[in-house]
Amino acid sequence: MISQQSAKHIENQWLALEIGNSRLHWALFMGESLEFTWDTEYLPESVIQQLGNGETKLEVGSEEKEIFFTFFPLPPAPCPLPLFIASVVPQQTVLWENYLNVRVITLDQIPLNNIYPTLGIDRALALWGAGMSWGFPVLVIDAGTALTFTAADGGKNLVGGAILPGVGLQFASLGQQTGQLPQVEMEAIKSLPPRFALNTTEAIQSGVIYTLIAGMRDFTEEWLSLFPDGKVAIKGGDRILLLNYLQALYPDLAARLIVEPNLIFWGMQTIVAGVA
């Protein structure tokens, strides 16, 4: 039997799901409050069906995994929490269409001006979340599978941005698409490599890291020259790694960056508040 207090918690709860290029990123909200976040690998269709039935202890292979335990009681089946999705992987989006209480957030729901049709929903939501949290104008750096720069001016107009391979993707492409270059693992890099390296592994590290940091510096300085009072926020799985390198090389510039991994979720929250 669910108490009135628990029922109130349940009524205000909803899930946000960002379907990224390599993983699923989750958030549990209590109304407008972000309670906590977690990541999972892509889930099998059978597990998605269990979630859609309101189950929280999921059978994944031979193991029972409590993927969706929370600090608040979850509703019993068949009443799954409302689920709002932002996806950059259409094949994954389709798998969630049978979830009983799902809404997919689309570009036309984001109140940015000058959006072009192929702008990634992740970039748009992160930009909107940053602007609504810290104000416009704002530049968002997303250090994920791709390293992206996305900016909006004080009138909430999309200024534009840029996309390039992220640090892991650059290492992987050199290791996989060349005949003799080794695969460099990011975990093996403990500090900045020598800029002029005397072995192949460190030469790859130097080339990738210093050019990425130079790109971050160039885009950030150009942005701040256009909008001296503008904000710069960084998110993404490699944010700490790249921010540490930027701090070591350009500490004054690094100090201008706002580190916030949940920009997309904050963007989703403002959209959900308007449609729920």
UniProtKB/Swiss-Prot annotation:
A monovalent cation. Ammonium or potassium. Coiled coil: none annotated. Substrate binds at residues 116, 120-123, 200. One of its GO terms (cellular component) is cytoplasm. Pathway: Cofactor biosynthesis; coenzyme A biosynthesis; CoA from (R)-pantothenate: step 1/5. GO terms for biological process: coenzyme A biosynthetic process. K(+) binds at residue 142. Its cofactor is NH4(+); K(+). Keywords: ATP-binding, Coenzyme A biosynthesis, Cytoplasm, Kinase, Metal-binding, Nucleotide-binding, Potassium, Transferase. ATP binds at residues 18-25, 145. CDD domains: ASKHA_NBD_PanK-III. It is found in: Cytoplasm. GO terms for molecular function: ATP binding; metal ion binding; pantothenate kinase activity. It holds the Pfam family Pan_kinase. Its EC number is 2.7.1.33. InterPro entries: ATPase_NBD, Type_III_PanK. Catalyzes the phosphorylation of pantothenate (Pan), the first step in CoA biosynthesis. This is Type III pantothenate kinase. It comes from Nostoc sp. (strain PCC 7120 / SAG 25.82 / UTEX 2576). The lineage of its organism: Bacteria, Bacillati, Cyanobacteriota, Cyanophyceae, Nostocales. The gene is coaX.
